[in-house]
Amino acid sequence: MRLFAGFSLFLSLGLLSFAPPLSEAPAGFDGKSNGLVDDPTHAADLAKFDEVEAISDGLGPLYNAQSCRECHQNPVSGGASQVSELRVGHRDAQGAFRNPDISINNGAEIIKGRSLINDRAICPSGAFPSTEIQEHVPDSEKVRTFRISLNLLGDGFVEALSDQTLEDLAKDQCKKTHGKICGQALYVPIVESPGKTGVGRFGWKDQQASLLSFSADAYLNEMGITSRLQPDEVTNLCNSVSEPNDKPGADGLSDIDHFARFMRALEAPARDASLSQTAGAKHGETLFEKVGCATCHVATLTTAPSGTPINGGNFTIPDALGGKTFHPYGDFLLHN
C-alpha cells in the first residue's frame, strides 16, 4: 500500500567518503515545480488538474468528483484530503474476496468487476427522466470500507524508484523481522505499455505502476471520463458523449498526459524545520525506529539515475527526478 505521509522528516545521512553526493528532492507546499518543467508549463498542468468537468466533457455516467482537485487539495492541489470513497464486496465459500454485482436501472443492467461504489450519477435527468443508475450496496456485500484520498505530493520521485528498489524493500523487511512481516512487491500491468509490467506503487492496493496509468484509472473511475488508455465506460446508460472523452488538445496532449506531468513535477512534502528540532520530535524519531515503525514506513529512498527508461520504456527519468533522495515515511508494499 502506497502511503506517502503528509509531511516528511529529513534524516541526516552519513555518507561514505567515496560515495557520490546525493541530491535531495525539492520539498515544499508552495505549489511550485520540482524542476521537471518551467513555471508556465506547471501552471497549465495545474489548471487541467483543477478544472471542473461537465457532462459535455464526458463526466459520468457514474462518478465521485468533478475535478482532480476536489479530492486532492490539502494543503495545495495534489495533496491529500478527508474525501473518501466506498469499496464493498463479499467472501466466497473459500474465503476469497469477490467483487459485487451492482444492479442499476431497476435491474436492467448489472455492473461487475469492481469494488468501487460511485457516489453520484448524471441521471435521472431532463434528458433521461426515467433512467435510474445511482449505485446502491446490496445486503449481500458484507465487506465494506471507506478509503480516503491519498497524497500525491512527491509521487514523481515514487515513480522514479526502480522496481529492484521496491523488491529489495520486501526482501529486507522479511529478513529483518525474521519472517514476521513480509510485504510484497506486486507486479501489475503498465497500461500505456501493453504486455509490460512494473511494481505497483500507486493506489491503496498498489494497482498502478505509472502515473499515466494512475491518471487514466482515476479519470475513468472517479470522474467517469474515458481516455485512450481506459476507453470503455462503466455503463453506457445516459451517455451521450463520444469515446474516448479525453481527446488531445492543440499541444497534442490529452488531459491524462497533463495530470501525469503535473504529478511528476510536484515537490515532495516539506519537513517542519522548527518542529523537527524540538526534543519531543527527536524523541519520537528515536521511538519510531526503536519500536519497528520504520520497518514498513521507510524513511529514506533514492530514485534511479537520470536517463533510466521506466514504465515499459514509455518514460525516461529526467535530471529533475533522477538520483534524488527523498523521505516518504511511506509503506510501498502489500501486506496480508
Model-predicted segments: where are they?
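Positively charged n-region of N-terminal signal peptides that target proteins for export
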Residues: 1-4
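Bacterial N-terminal signal peptides
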Residues: 6-16
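Periplasmic c-type cytochrome electron-transfer domains
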Residues: 17-336
